[in-house]
Amino acid sequence: MAAMTVQLDIVSAESSIFSGRVASLQVTGSEGELGIMHGHAPLLSYIKPGMARIVKQDGNEEVFYLSGGLLEVQPSSVSVLADVVMRAKDIDEQAALEAKRRAEAHMATAGADFNYDAAMVELAKAMAQLRVVETIKKNIAR
């Protein structure tokens, strides 16, 4: 019996990052963790900055960092639209650590005109990238 799969397209503002048949997709939506498989009910959701984990048709996994965006689930396809998408292997861990430190420093020395929401978004993105890196390290260690 053939594996039940769904067409997945992951697109950034710059280019198409992934297009193919997948057994599953795991992302963090606005209301929590989402697991999408063949036959999932139609859905439209915001995606929080974080990890997208796919299990390809052949059973191999691939992990991406998403800066946030939109998820659309239709009966025959799933689309992920994000401003920034990075393959986990392409994330610069040191740059993410530095971005986290900068955001924390800005928040600690904030004045009256400080944009706290923007700093929180930058901090969330940096921390999400670091979580993706840690996940990859754990998988390699197994």
UniProtKB/Swiss-Prot annotation:
It comes from the Bacteria. GO terms for biological process: proton motive force-driven ATP synthesis. The keyword Electron transport does not apply. GO terms for cellular component: plasma membrane; proton-transporting ATP synthase complex. One of its GO terms (molecular function) is proton-transporting ATP synthase activity, rotational mechanism. It is found in: Cell inner membrane. It is a peripheral membrane protein. Keywords: ATP synthesis, Cell inner membrane, Cell membrane, CF(1), Hydrogen ion transport, Ion transport, Membrane, Transport. Gene3D superfamilies: ATP synthase delta/epsilon subunit, C-terminal domain, F0F1 ATP synthase delta/epsilon subunit, N-terminal. Belongs to the ATPase epsilon chain family. F-type ATPases have 2 components, CF(1) - the catalytic core - and CF(0) - the membrane proton channel. CF(1) has five subunits: alpha(3), beta(3), gamma(1), delta(1), epsilon(1). CF(0) has three main subunits: a, b and c. Produces ATP from ADP in the presence of a proton gradient across the membrane. PANTHER family: ATP SYNTHASE DELTA/EPSILON CHAIN, ATP SYNTHASE EPSILON CHAIN, CHLOROPLASTIC. This is ATP synthase epsilon chain. It comes from Shewanella oneidensis (strain ATCC 700550 / JCM 31522 / CIP 106686 / LMG 19005 / NCIMB 14063 / MR-1).
